[in-house]
Amino acid sequence: MPNRKIPRATAKRLPVYYRYLNVLLNANKHRVSSTELSEAVQVDSATIRRDFSYFGELGKRGYGYDVEKLLNFFKGILKQDKLTSVALVGVGSLGSALMNYNFHQSTNLRISAAFDPKESLANTVKSGIPVYPVEDMKKQIKEQQIDAVILTVPGSESQAVTDQLVEAGVHGILNFTPVRLSVPKDVQVQNIDLTNELQTLIYFIESNKVTTDDED
C-alpha cells in the first residue's frame, strides 16, 4: 500500500464501505462498480474512487471491484481480521448502555474491561464485563494490551482520566464527554457529542422547512 496519509474524512468512510461489502458478499454478489456502491452508501462515485485510490489499484477499469478481495483488503486495514478489545471508563447510564450493547453485531470488537471510581461498582461484573476500580486501570490496560478506550465519565473528570490513560499507553479515545481533551500527537481522539449532533440535526430540519415553505 502506498505510504500516504489518509484524510480523516476518507478514514471515516472506510467502515461504511466495509459494512456494505459484507452485505454484498452475503448476497453472493461478486462484483460491484463505484456507481453501485455510490447508490448504496450515499457517497458520490468520484469520492469513492478517490478514497480507494489512496490504497493503490483496488479495481479494474471496465470491470469494477472484486467484492471478496476488496472486503478482505478493508478487513485488514480496519483490523477486522482479529479480535480487538477496548476498555470503557465511566459506568454511568451511557456507559452501562454501551456495555449492554458491546458491539453484538461485530465479531471482532468487544469491551473487555470497564473502570469506575464508585466503590459500589468496582470489582463487579456488568453485562458480562468485569468492572475494575480506577486504581487498576493502568495495570489492566497494559496487561490486556488495550489500545482504545471509550470515555463516558463526567466532564469535570475527563482530562484527569485521559492523562492516566495516556500514561497507560492508550493510543485512541472515543470521547463522549463535552470536554475537548488535551493529548499527545500520537494519541487519536474521536469526539462524540450527542447534544451537538442533535442540535445540528434540528438545524437542518428547520432549514429544510424554511426552504420548503419558500418553494410553496
Swiss-Prot record:
The primary gene name is rex
Q: Which InterPro entries match?
A: CoA-bd, NAD(P)-bd_dom_sf, Rex_DNA-bd_C_dom, Tscrpt_rep_Rex, WH-like_DNA-bd_sf, WH_DNA-bd_sf
Q: Which UniProt keywords apply?
A: Cytoplasm, DNA-binding, NAD, Repressor, Transcription, Transcription regulation
Q: What is its main location?
A: cytoplasm
Q: Which family does it belong to?
A: Belongs to the transcriptional regulatory Rex family.
Role according to the record: Modulates transcription in response to changes in cellular NADH/NAD(+) redox state.
Q: Which organism is it from?
A: Limosilactobacillus fermentum (strain NBRC 3956 / LMG 18251) (Lactobacillus fermentum)
Q: Name one Pfam family in it.
A: Put_DNA-bind_N
GO CC annotation: what is one?
Answer: cytoplasm
Question: Gene3D superfamilies, per this entry?
Answer: NAD(P)-binding Rossmann-like Domain, Winged helix-like DNA-binding domain superfamily/Winged helix DNA-binding domain
The organism's taxonomy opens as:
Bacteria, Bacillati, Bacillota, Bacilli, Lactobacillales
Gene Ontology MF, one:
DNA-binding transcription factor activity
Q: List the disulfide bonds.
A: none
DNA-binding region, residue range(s): 16-55
Q: What's a BP term from Gene Ontology annotated to this protein?
A: negative regulation of DNA-templated transcription
Assembly information from the UniProt record: Homodimer.
| Localization terms from the record | Cytoplasm
Question: What is the name of the protein in this document?
Answer: Redox-sensing transcriptional repressor Rex
Annotated residues for binding of NAD(+): 90-95
